[in-house]
From Swiss-Prot:
It is an enzyme of class 3 (hydrolase). Keywords: Aminopeptidase, Hydrolase, Manganese, Metal-binding, Metalloprotease, Protease. It holds the Pfam family AMP_N. It comes from Aspergillus fumigatus (strain ATCC MYA-4609 / CBS 101355 / FGSC A1100 / Af293) (Neosartorya fumigata). Belongs to the peptidase M24B family. Its EC number is 3.4.11.9. Mn(2+) 1 binds at D278, E416, E455. Catalyzes the removal of a penultimate prolyl residue from the N-termini of peptides. Its cofactor is Mn(2+). This is Probable Xaa-Pro aminopeptidase AFUA_1G14920. One of its GO terms (molecular function) is metalloaminopeptidase activity. Binds 2 manganese ions per subunit.
Length: 487
């Protein structure tokens, strides 16, 4: 049933297992992705568990459904309570759908039937869940003495009728992580579409922001625009922080008034067919920058982002771009009199710039907004000392880590520099060794700004890069705000 070429299992000379499943006859009709791993096997059974239906605690109301991303990556199925097996030796992909439940069908509508699943998904077999236990038992009886059953987690062991299964719960997860780090054409299209909808929503906010009075209105309009354009789900909780709230990296309360605030940091991205976008724009609550300080910080972050984006290409180490961003930030903050008393390199090595730019420069984007990827087993000796001053591990995601591989064609990464003036961070910095490099009196004048972050999703291409994010920024952003006044 599955299409030829990429949908077949291929075991190469290096024992790479490539599994690509075509999503046919549905709204995507594309490959959802592939799994590549040096499993070193020609037989075995891959077993994946989809997201079950779960109620809220102490409630009869179900939680919103969100498919497990590893399951979706291999199957393309966005239905609850499904299972998937792949018999490597026999090249047999089987989807298990929920058994028919009359009570549920009356209340909620029927679940996916075998016939519907066959028409929608290009798999070899579709069976009801009642067959799952017996099918796995038969596979185990025939093959499990010499072949393993591969699962993602120890908590996802299948039930069988008898006997202990020979399982492996260590190899499949890193194999899928490595595959997900490189996006194919279908995945790039999904991320591009998510960005298209996000750009529409960001633009709509800019057109109307001067008529708004609360952060909640910003969040509401963004959601309304996304849903009305077919993107029901957000890739993450919307961050609409005004004033000092813009200095809170993951501020999601979005419940304060806008009056008297200078800027809004809007970090919001739609999801499209389970694929994320991640977009941040910072804009004034006026037709122009309300203060020279706000303008200067925006232009500094703009420079940080532009200089880093122009250097993205395959073979680049992403952490080197983070170093560059910190160097540009330090130079700019020294010009503004916020950093002082040392050379750029001395200040960078001290870690003082992390008070103002505490997070990583970016991360992978895909089925998760902070997507997974392959990791090097060891970092190059000496790296840790060089990068440690500008790297806060708890606030950094791959590829902004020592274990990250070099950028490769097909990776999608964010570039999201920011400069923040957090009361808490500044108060804590007074107690640290690098305090001598910070002019606290000057820095505290910038606290009303909160923070500025600009974030785009960048595809690494064969010849360099492509910016997938089209949300307005810079002068175009200001022009839209101004036109909104007159409309």
């Amino acid at each position: 049933m599955r299409g030829s070429g990429r949908s077949d299992i291929v075991i190469s000379a290096v024992d790479a297992l490539d599994i690509c499943i075509t999503l046919a006859r549905n709204d995507c009709d594309k490959y959802p992705g592939s799994v590549a791993a040096k499993l070193g096997v020609s037989s075995g059974l891959i077993y994946l568990v989809g997201q079950p239906t779960i109620n809220w605690g102490d409630s009869d109301q179900p939680r919103p459904f969100r498919q497990r991303r590893y399951f979706y990556y291999l199957s393309g199925v966005e239905e609850a309570d499904c299972y998937l097996t792949y018999d490597i030796k026999n090249d047999l992909l089987t989807l298990y759908v929920p058994d028919f439940d009359l009570h549920r069908a009356i209340w909620m509508g029927p679940t996916l039937t075998v016939k519907e699943a066959r028409e929608r998904y290009d798999v070899d077999q579709v069976r009801y869940h009642a067959s799952l236990k017996g099918d796995i038992q038969r596979w185990a009886d025939n093959y499990n003495k010499t072949s393993l059953l591969y699962i993602l987690h120890d908590t996802q062991k299948p039930q069988v009728l008898s006997n202990e299964l020979r399982l492996d719960d260590e190899l499949l997860l890193p194999a899928m992580d490595a595959a997900r780090g490189i996006k194919d054409e279908h995945e790039i299209r999904m991320i591009r579409e998510a960005n298209r909808v996000s750009a529409l929503a960001h633009r709509k906010v800019l057109e109307n922001v001067l008529r708004m009075s609360t952060e909640a209105e910003i969040e509401g309009l963004f959601l309304d625009t996304c849903i009305s354009h077919g993107a029901k789900n957000q890739a993450y909780e919307i961050i609409a922080g005004s004033g000092e709230n813009a200095a809170v990296l993951h501020y999601v309360k979005n419940n304060e008034p806008l009056q008297g605030r200078q800027l809004v940091c809007l970090d919001a991205g739609a999801e499209w067919n389970c694929y994320a976008s991640d977009v941040t724009r910072t804009f004034p609550l006026a037709a122009d920058w309300p203060t020279a300080r706000a303008r200067d910080i925006y232009q500094l972050v703009e420079e940080m982002q532009e200089e880093c984006i122009k250097r993205i290409q395959k073979g680049v180490r992403f952490l080197d771009l983070q170093v560059l961003a910190h160097v540009i930030a330090i130079e700019g903050l020294m010009r503004l009199g916020i950093l002082k008393g040392g050379s750029v390199e001395e200040i960078r090595e001290s870690g003082a710039s992390t008070v103002f730019f505490p997070h990583g420069l970016g991360h992978h984007v895909g089925l998760e907004v902070h997507d997974v990827s392959a990791k090097r087993l060891t970092a190059v000796e000496g790296d840790k000392e060089y990068y440690s001053s500008i790297l806060v591990p708890s606030m950094s995601h791959c590829p902004c880590t020592l274990s990250a591989p070099l950028l490769e064609e097909g990776m999608v990464v964010t570039v999201e520099p920011g400069i923040y003036f957090s009361r808490l961070a500044l108060a804590n910095a007074r107690k640290l060794a690098f305090a001598k490099y910070i002019n606290f009196d000057e820095a505290e004048k910038y606290i009303p700004i909160g923070g500025v972050r600009i974030e785009d999703d960048i595809l690494v291409t064969s010849s360099g890069h492509e910016n997938l994010t089209t949300a307005p920024k810079g002068e175009e952003m200001l022009e839209i705000i101004r036109r909104g006044i007159d409309s």
